């Protein structure tokens, strides 16, 4: 079993998704039980001319998202406080700027890219990190995590290790993913995309809705006592199948157990769990069985992809932001669009929004290919 970790302050966080720009829009939609799933195009949001070489759909969404809730100012203040070489930048993305690479393939002239797409900073999994490093001016460690749907949950774990080992004093975390043909065609080929808004844990669920999001967080060893804390995390791999979770949920169980151990918590200490809940038949079946085995009926749980869609590599940090907002405002978000809950999870699943205090919460990200991460959060000292 892993040993308990020292909590990290989450000094700032923000998220932009189909629900809107920033925490206010996110909280308003969650409280109004309003889905954001609709056709959308944010590409009118430009990058500043100085960053023209990084211009692509993914980096535009990153720039749009980082401007919300004063996060850009908070990140720059941390860099000023600690020094540019003592602030790590850890990013999670499933596809990065692959949309620009797809555009390049479509525009090939013989075997050459058109001049406007001959930009090596785009055609790499590290495009997001390179762009944010340039935009923020960080000179500390810069790491990209690309583990499918758990990518931007795992960045919290990476940051904790960097800070604990003395590699950095603080970390700026980013998770961004946007639509691209590779994802749309891939999930359609697997027959995993629903023709309607997804219904997590509903007995009639029939697949995912794909979304886009950008989320950011600033974590530090010290911070305002009122700030929420990252108190634990667990990571695992199913080592089972490229697209199907282990039928007994072995990886999910290990991630949950390790998160609780690092936080020094028992299952009944948890008030709320934001479930991965993709609305695919097998994923939800396995997660429901694990939840029923590990947690009692007093623990409340919900899945929020009915609000935002499955934002892939950005899902971890987006759903961490939702969890932190739920803790801050004292409510359990609804499991939107779902009506008839999977029997195994019916006792814990909040179909409708519930008002209740939340002091300790978990957020699950159980990714494609069996890459799993559970994050544990605790509320800060009351104001």
Task: Give each language-model segment a name.
Residues 53-72, 115-125, 142-154, 198-215, ...:
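Active-site pocket-shaping loop/turn-to-helix segments
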Residues 1-10, 265-269, 345-383:
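Flexible, low-complexity linker/loop segments at domain and module junctions
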Residues 12, 30, 89, 132, ...:
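Conserved small-residue
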Residues 100, 178-200, 235-254, 278-290, ...:
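Active-site-adjacent elements of ketosynthase-type condensing enzymes
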Residues 125-129, 133-136, 141-175, 210-225, ...:
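Active-site-proximal alpha-helical scaffold in enzymes
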Residues 93-143, 283-296:
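Active-site-proximal gating segment of KS-fold condensing enzymes and close homologs
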Residues 5-17, 23-40, 193, 197-263, ...:
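Condensing-enzyme catalytic core mediating Claisen C-C bond formation in acyl metabolism
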Residues 2-3, 19, 24-100, 255, ...:
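Conserved active-site "lid/cap" helical segment
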